[in-house]
């Protein structure tokens, strides 16, 4: 029984569950998608909130440049490159034996400074927002001051009386632990069994307390939440429900618009933009997709990609039960090499907020992630961690889908030929050489 209903009844009502339970790569194109002008109201946040977050990051830029010299060239703004990957596109055409019209680009959040993943957006933003609240309330800075003063010993001593806590499969903990420690906070990261050892080691090297669990992500989050509950000096970063995290990710969209403009890429109804976002609990891709819908409206089509063993958002939105169901309820084990996506229960906040804004969801098996990892390195010389490749099959899934999605959305052959597909590469820039070598060897063996 699942939520009081026999499994057979679930399968009768939701036939796509059969593929999810069998761990078969599958896709579902959302029939409930609505015009963005209407569906954006579901989120409970708006353009003014994203602009406020962007302004906050601007205020902190002098401090970031001071604490992290690698950001000095961008003036303390944490941003990633946008690159066309035409050779990888050609390799995918061969790999999938399909034409795959349009152009293919890669958003390299894998190489964001400070923590080398998309979590350098939301995670760092939430810690900065919390630090700003404390600093303003306690007279450490004023809104118009130079925030680099927060690196001074008296400010660090003040922050040392406060703790930041988070539950993570790895990358979120890495970003929050590093920025928290850099500001002077005590930081504790509750890490699930999936977390890579090198990420734990890196955090400890920064003076962060790492608490390890034999269980999965949801348990780590719950323990982190419990630690913070009774302590007014502890701020818990709630990856399942945080609006600050969500807004930190959403800021990416306006910056991407500038990068697309600079590259001469049009985005409108005749030149659609498809953005393929790896999804774990949902905060990162949800926030980015929200920002994209604000920036491009119905001209952008956002799709979430998940491992076959951890399809939590697909499951939650498809059944309409969101965080009430986990993949484990259906006998799916939530064990995947895509450690950043190893989440069994989705964010109910993101699922409900975004369910009418997302075009679809698809799953990818681990072997395919490794093949694509090796294929990208072979064709473009770009190295990513497995979870960052989840969006790479998206161009083929959209082109070949049999569910009437393209017709429903008015995606004619001419529009698909004019399309830009953007794979959001979420992590991998800080993977140790030996570990990356093992990833590549596994991928090459599967390809050859």
Curated annotation (Swiss-Prot):
* Origin: domain of life: Bacteria
Coiled coil segments of this chain = none
Q: Which cofactor does it need?
A: pyridoxal 5'-phosphate
Q: Reaction catalysed by this chain?
A: D-serine = pyruvate + NH4(+)
The species this protein belongs to is: Pseudomonas paraeruginosa (strain DSM 24068 / PA7)
Positions of transmembrane segments: none
In the UniProt record, does the keyword Lyase occur?
yes
Q: Which Gene3D superfamilies does the UniProt record give?
A: 3.40.50.1100
Q: What is its EC number?
A: 4.3.1.18
The protein's name is Probable D-serine dehydratase
UniProt KW Lyase keyword: yes
Give this protein's Gene Ontology molecular function annotations.
Answer: D-serine ammonia-lyase activity; hydro-lyase activity; pyridoxal phosphate binding
- In the record, N6-(pyridoxal phosphate)lysine modifications are located at 119
Alphabetical GO biological process terms:
D-serine catabolic process; isoleucine biosynthetic process
Which keywords does this chain's UniProt record carry?
Answer: Lyase, Pyridoxal phosphate
Q: What family does the database annotate? A: Belongs to the serine/threonine dehydratase family. DsdA subfamily.
PROSITE patterns on file: DEHYDRATASE_SER_THR (PS00165)
Q: What class of enzyme is it?
A: lyase
